Amino acid sequence: MNVRPFAIPHDAQEPVGYAFSCGTLTCGVATDIGCVQEGWMRAVSGCQALVLEANHDVNMVEHGRYPAHLKRRILGRRGHLNNEDCARALLRLVESGTQAVFLAHLSADNNLPELAYNTVCGALERAGCAVGADVSVRVARRDCVSDMLVLEDGQSRAAD
């Protein structure tokens, strides 16, 4: 297995995401990413499966209980990826071969699993991407183990 770290825009000491490959199978993990940048997009382009941050809904952050400095941090380019930007990034990644994504690192205070899923899937569908056929979208939950995804021969499928 080949593990390739790549830089991500986050306000931590040398933060990285990861791209994994084994033969023709590829997957990536990109969370704690403040914004869409060509560097990390290039690193996960072509990955069949991704764990991708959909941290927050901008409206929930702006009108939520967090202090102003924390809101600025979350919404900043080195903070966390919002649902809409996640959707825009995923659309490009599906065009490069991504078949399955787990929406991850959802904020407990500034997002809802259904909201993240509906925002991302709605944007994909409006752009002509068939969710379920062109790409599988799932939400990684904080409170339990997610469904298993099996990658084989360049295809992804849910485990039986």
Which ranges hold each PLM region?
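Core dinuclear metal-dependent hydrolase active-site scaffold
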Residues: M1-A49, D143-C144, M148-D160
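Cap/insert and terminal regions of metallo-dependent hydrolase folds
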Residues: E38-R138
